[in-house]
Amino acid sequence: MARDKVTIARLRSLEDEGALVINSAYGIDNCVRKPMTELLIKNGVPHPQSFIISTADEYLENCYPCWVKRGDSHAMVKEDVAYATCKEEVENILADFRKRGIPVAVINEHLQGDLVKFYGVHGTDFFYWFYPSPCSHSKFGLEKINGIAKGIPFSVEELKIQSDKAAEALNVPIYGGDCVVSADGTPRIRDF
């Protein structure tokens, strides 16, 4: 999926002129962390407990461990997504975001369970999923925090249903994402 702002602006312009754009520039904008979180929650897609805050504000919630993620963009560098186990770590991450000019953060509870990556096409039977731990599939190496997947049983059909629901809410018919399958088999989408 395109991420460069100039490329997205060009796609948006072409789309507005009537060109066929498979994953809409508007949908790509919806996948920026803050709007993505808001849309997934609004549309009832199973998602971690989340808080959206200004990086200038103090984090007052008691939700640890957690993930602190830049809210104004996709993760571009490793430091855009950080794991925190206490308030001091969250405050240090927010301070780093402020120094880098990042105005908003999304804080997600850390979900215990098996990390699953998936890819699909909304409205079709195409859906592929896998555990990233055995094949060392990683963007920034943070998947190791969830550890090696235990193979918790879950409904692939339900994950496909929820993924298609997310794709529709975000307006991205060709998609990929991450979820965590909890001990009871419930998948919750944490990235799309």
Residue spans of the language-model regions?
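Conserved metal-phosphate-binding beta-hairpin within the catalytic cores
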Residues: A167-F192
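Short, charged, surface-exposed secondary-structure boundary motifs
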Residues: N30-P35, M76-K78, S138
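Phosphate-binding site of ATP-dependent enzymes
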Residues: Y83-L170
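ATP-grasp fold ATP-binding core
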Residues: L40, E61-E79, I102-V116
